[in-house]
Protein backbone atom coordinates (compact mmCIF):
# COMPACT_ATOMS: atom_id res chain seq x y z
CA UNK A 1 0.00 0.00 0.00
CA UNK A 2 0.92 3.68 -0.04
CA UNK A 3 1.28 5.93 2.98
CA UNK A 4 0.07 9.52 3.38
CA UNK A 5 3.14 10.77 1.50
CA UNK A 6 2.29 8.41 -1.37
CA UNK A 7 5.36 6.29 -0.67
CA UNK A 8 4.91 2.58 -1.23
CA UNK A 9 5.14 0.49 1.95
CA UNK A 10 6.00 -3.22 2.11
CA UNK A 11 5.75 -5.73 4.95
CA UNK A 12 5.96 -9.49 5.29
CA UNK A 13 2.46 -9.62 6.83
CA UNK A 14 -0.63 -7.46 6.19
CA UNK A 15 -1.19 -6.76 9.89
CA UNK A 16 2.09 -4.82 10.01
CA UNK A 17 0.64 -2.29 7.56
CA UNK A 18 -2.56 -1.58 9.45
CA UNK A 19 -2.68 2.13 10.27
CA UNK A 20 0.16 2.96 7.88
CA UNK A 21 -1.74 2.72 4.59
CA UNK A 22 -5.36 3.09 3.51
CA UNK A 23 -5.41 0.06 1.22
CA UNK A 24 -3.42 -3.18 1.57
CA UNK A 25 -2.79 -5.41 -1.44
CA UNK A 26 -0.65 -8.56 -1.80
CA UNK A 27 2.73 -8.33 -3.52
CA UNK A 28 2.02 -10.35 -6.68
CA UNK A 29 4.05 -13.58 -6.89
CA UNK A 30 6.51 -13.88 -9.74
CA UNK A 31 7.07 -10.10 -9.82
CA UNK A 32 9.61 -7.55 -8.70
CA UNK A 33 8.97 -3.86 -8.05
CA UNK A 34 10.96 -1.23 -9.92
CA UNK A 35 10.40 2.43 -10.75
CA UNK A 36 6.84 2.43 -9.46
CA UNK A 37 5.60 -0.66 -11.29
CA UNK A 38 5.45 -4.41 -10.74
CA UNK A 39 7.39 -6.35 -13.37
CA UNK A 40 6.61 -10.01 -13.98
CA UNK A 41 9.66 -12.28 -14.26
CA UNK A 42 7.98 -15.68 -13.91
CA UNK A 43 4.53 -17.12 -14.56
CA UNK A 44 3.79 -20.65 -13.34
CA UNK A 45 0.55 -20.75 -15.33
CA UNK A 46 2.11 -19.89 -18.67
CA UNK A 47 1.95 -22.70 -21.22
CA UNK A 48 5.03 -22.59 -23.44
CA UNK A 49 3.57 -25.07 -25.91
CA UNK A 50 0.78 -27.64 -25.96
CA UNK A 51 1.88 -31.25 -25.37
CA UNK A 52 0.39 -33.96 -27.56
CA UNK A 53 2.34 -36.94 -26.22
CA UNK A 54 0.50 -40.13 -25.31
CA UNK A 55 -0.71 -40.54 -21.73
CA UNK A 56 2.05 -42.99 -20.73
CA UNK A 57 4.75 -40.55 -21.85
CA UNK A 58 3.12 -37.66 -20.01
CA UNK A 59 2.76 -39.69 -16.80
CA UNK A 60 6.38 -40.82 -16.99
CA UNK A 61 7.46 -37.20 -17.44
CA UNK A 62 5.51 -36.12 -14.36
CA UNK A 63 6.87 -39.06 -12.37
CA UNK A 64 10.49 -38.23 -13.21
CA UNK A 65 10.05 -34.55 -12.32
CA UNK A 66 8.34 -35.36 -9.02
CA UNK A 67 11.05 -37.83 -8.00
CA UNK A 68 13.80 -35.36 -8.92
CA UNK A 69 12.05 -32.59 -6.97
CA UNK A 70 11.71 -34.66 -3.80
CA UNK A 71 15.25 -36.02 -4.05
CA UNK A 72 16.67 -32.50 -4.40
CA UNK A 73 14.91 -31.37 -1.23
CA UNK A 74 16.22 -34.25 0.83
CA UNK A 75 19.56 -32.44 0.85
CA UNK A 76 19.38 -30.34 4.02
CA UNK A 77 21.66 -29.24 6.84
CA UNK A 78 18.99 -29.99 9.45
CA UNK A 79 16.91 -33.09 10.15
CA UNK A 80 14.00 -33.51 7.75
CA UNK A 81 10.50 -34.61 8.67
CA UNK A 82 7.43 -35.27 6.54
CA UNK A 83 3.79 -34.37 6.97
CA UNK A 84 1.62 -37.34 6.01
CA UNK A 85 -2.16 -37.06 5.73
CA UNK A 86 -2.73 -40.26 3.80
CA UNK A 87 -3.87 -38.29 0.75
CA UNK A 88 -2.35 -38.33 -2.72
CA UNK A 89 0.12 -35.45 -2.40
CA UNK A 90 1.80 -36.28 0.89
CA UNK A 91 1.71 -40.05 0.31
CA UNK A 92 3.61 -39.70 -2.96
CA UNK A 93 6.21 -37.38 -1.44
CA UNK A 94 6.74 -39.68 1.54
CA UNK A 95 6.90 -42.82 -0.61
CA UNK A 96 9.57 -41.30 -2.86
CA UNK A 97 11.57 -40.02 0.11
CA UNK A 98 11.37 -43.42 1.82
CA UNK A 99 12.87 -45.05 -1.27
CA UNK A 100 15.64 -42.49 -1.58
CA UNK A 101 16.55 -42.31 2.12
CA UNK A 102 19.11 -44.75 3.59
CA UNK A 103 17.10 -45.01 6.83
CA UNK A 104 13.39 -44.77 7.71
CA UNK A 105 12.00 -41.28 7.26
CA UNK A 106 10.04 -39.60 10.07
CA UNK A 107 6.41 -38.95 9.23
CA UNK A 108 3.78 -37.03 11.19
CA UNK A 109 0.00 -37.10 11.04
CA UNK A 110 -2.65 -35.25 13.01
CA UNK A 111 -6.25 -36.07 13.77
CA UNK A 112 -9.09 -35.67 16.22
CA UNK A 113 -9.53 -37.98 19.18
CA UNK A 114 -12.78 -39.24 17.59
CA UNK A 115 -13.45 -40.45 14.02
CA UNK A 116 -9.91 -39.69 12.84
CA UNK A 117 -10.18 -41.09 9.30
CA UNK A 118 -7.06 -39.21 8.15
CA UNK A 119 -5.01 -40.92 10.85
CA UNK A 120 -6.18 -44.29 9.57
CA UNK A 121 -5.08 -43.62 6.00
CA UNK A 122 -1.80 -42.01 7.09
CA UNK A 123 -1.07 -45.04 9.28
CA UNK A 124 -1.64 -47.39 6.36
CA UNK A 125 0.77 -45.42 4.17
CA UNK A 126 3.36 -45.21 6.97
CA UNK A 127 3.23 -48.97 7.50
CA UNK A 128 3.55 -49.60 3.77
CA UNK A 129 6.62 -47.37 3.30
CA UNK A 130 8.17 -48.33 6.67
CA UNK A 131 8.43 -44.83 8.12
CA UNK A 132 9.03 -43.86 11.74
CA UNK A 133 5.50 -42.55 12.24
CA UNK A 134 4.12 -40.20 14.89
CA UNK A 135 0.44 -39.40 15.43
CA UNK A 136 -0.59 -36.12 17.03
CA UNK A 137 -4.04 -36.45 18.61
CA UNK A 138 -6.06 -33.29 19.18
CA UNK A 139 -9.38 -32.55 20.84
CA UNK A 140 -12.22 -30.16 20.07
CA UNK A 141 -10.83 -27.79 22.70
CA UNK A 142 -7.41 -27.81 20.99
CA UNK A 143 -9.06 -26.75 17.74
CA UNK A 144 -11.04 -23.94 19.36
CA UNK A 145 -7.98 -22.64 21.23
CA UNK A 146 -5.96 -22.61 18.00
CA UNK A 147 -8.58 -20.71 16.02
CA UNK A 148 -7.62 -17.17 17.07
CA UNK A 149 -3.82 -17.55 16.64
CA UNK A 150 -4.35 -19.27 13.29
CA UNK A 151 -6.52 -16.42 11.98
CA UNK A 152 -3.91 -13.94 13.23
CA UNK A 153 -0.96 -15.67 11.58
CA UNK A 154 -2.78 -16.20 8.28
CA UNK A 155 -4.14 -12.67 8.00
CA UNK A 156 -7.23 -13.99 6.20
CA UNK A 157 -10.85 -14.76 6.98
CA UNK A 158 -11.15 -17.36 4.20
CA UNK A 159 -13.06 -20.20 5.89
CA UNK A 160 -11.53 -23.08 3.91
CA UNK A 161 -7.97 -21.86 4.44
CA UNK A 162 -8.51 -21.35 8.17
CA UNK A 163 -10.11 -24.77 8.60
CA UNK A 164 -7.27 -26.51 6.74
CA UNK A 165 -4.64 -24.52 8.64
CA UNK A 166 -5.67 -25.49 12.16
CA UNK A 167 -4.45 -29.07 11.87
CA UNK A 168 -1.26 -28.05 10.10
CA UNK A 169 -0.52 -25.39 12.69
CA UNK A 170 -1.00 -27.83 15.57
CA UNK A 171 1.08 -30.63 14.05
CA UNK A 172 3.91 -28.19 13.24
CA UNK A 173 3.71 -26.84 16.79
CA UNK A 174 4.03 -30.37 18.18
CA UNK A 175 6.98 -31.14 15.89
CA UNK A 176 8.80 -27.99 17.01
CA UNK A 177 8.17 -28.64 20.71
CA UNK A 178 8.75 -32.39 20.80
CA UNK A 179 11.45 -33.12 18.20
CA UNK A 180 14.70 -31.72 16.82
CA UNK A 181 13.34 -31.66 13.26
CA UNK A 182 13.59 -28.23 11.68
CA UNK A 183 12.82 -28.92 8.01
CA UNK A 184 9.49 -30.28 6.79
CA UNK A 185 8.42 -31.66 3.45
CA UNK A 186 4.74 -31.76 2.61
CA UNK A 187 2.68 -32.55 -0.44
CA UNK A 188 0.73 -29.77 -2.08
CA UNK A 189 -0.76 -28.61 -5.37
CA UNK A 190 -1.59 -31.86 -7.21
CA UNK A 191 -5.30 -31.09 -6.88
CA UNK A 192 -4.85 -27.65 -8.37
CA UNK A 193 -2.71 -28.93 -11.23
CA UNK A 194 -4.98 -31.82 -12.12
CA UNK A 195 -8.34 -30.35 -11.47
CA UNK A 196 -10.09 -31.18 -8.19
CA UNK A 197 -13.59 -32.56 -8.78
CA UNK A 198 -14.08 -29.77 -11.33
CA UNK A 199 -12.48 -32.06 -13.91
CA UNK A 200 -15.62 -34.20 -13.92
CA UNK A 201 -17.84 -31.26 -14.86
CA UNK A 202 -15.64 -29.04 -17.04
CA UNK A 203 -17.57 -28.43 -20.29
CA UNK A 204 -14.38 -28.46 -22.37
CA UNK A 205 -10.62 -28.97 -22.17
CA UNK A 206 -10.19 -25.21 -22.52
CA UNK A 207 -12.44 -24.53 -19.53
CA UNK A 208 -10.56 -27.11 -17.47
CA UNK A 209 -7.25 -25.45 -18.38
CA UNK A 210 -8.67 -22.04 -17.48
CA UNK A 211 -9.79 -23.29 -14.06
CA UNK A 212 -6.46 -25.02 -13.35
CA UNK A 213 -4.56 -21.84 -14.26
CA UNK A 214 -6.82 -19.78 -11.99
CA UNK A 215 -6.23 -22.11 -9.04
CA UNK A 216 -2.45 -22.05 -9.55
CA UNK A 217 -2.47 -18.27 -9.94
CA UNK A 218 -4.29 -17.87 -6.60
CA UNK A 219 -2.27 -20.41 -4.61
CA UNK A 220 -0.44 -17.73 -2.65
CA UNK A 221 -3.75 -16.68 -1.09
CA UNK A 222 -4.78 -20.17 0.02
CA UNK A 223 -2.72 -23.39 0.16
CA UNK A 224 0.70 -21.76 -0.08
CA UNK A 225 -0.34 -19.19 2.52
CA UNK A 226 -1.40 -22.01 4.85
CA UNK A 227 1.77 -24.04 4.43
CA UNK A 228 4.13 -21.06 4.62
CA UNK A 229 2.61 -19.47 7.72
CA UNK A 230 1.87 -22.64 9.70
CA UNK A 231 5.39 -23.96 9.18
CA UNK A 232 7.37 -20.74 9.60
CA UNK A 233 5.51 -19.51 12.70
CA UNK A 234 6.72 -22.68 14.42
CA UNK A 235 10.37 -22.00 13.51
CA UNK A 236 10.40 -24.68 10.81
CA UNK A 237 11.31 -24.51 7.16
Predicted regions span which residues?
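ATP-dependent adenylate-handling active sites, centered on carboxylate activation for C-N bond formation
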Residues: 1-4, 47-237
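N-terminal segments that mediate ammonia production and transfer
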Residues: 1-56
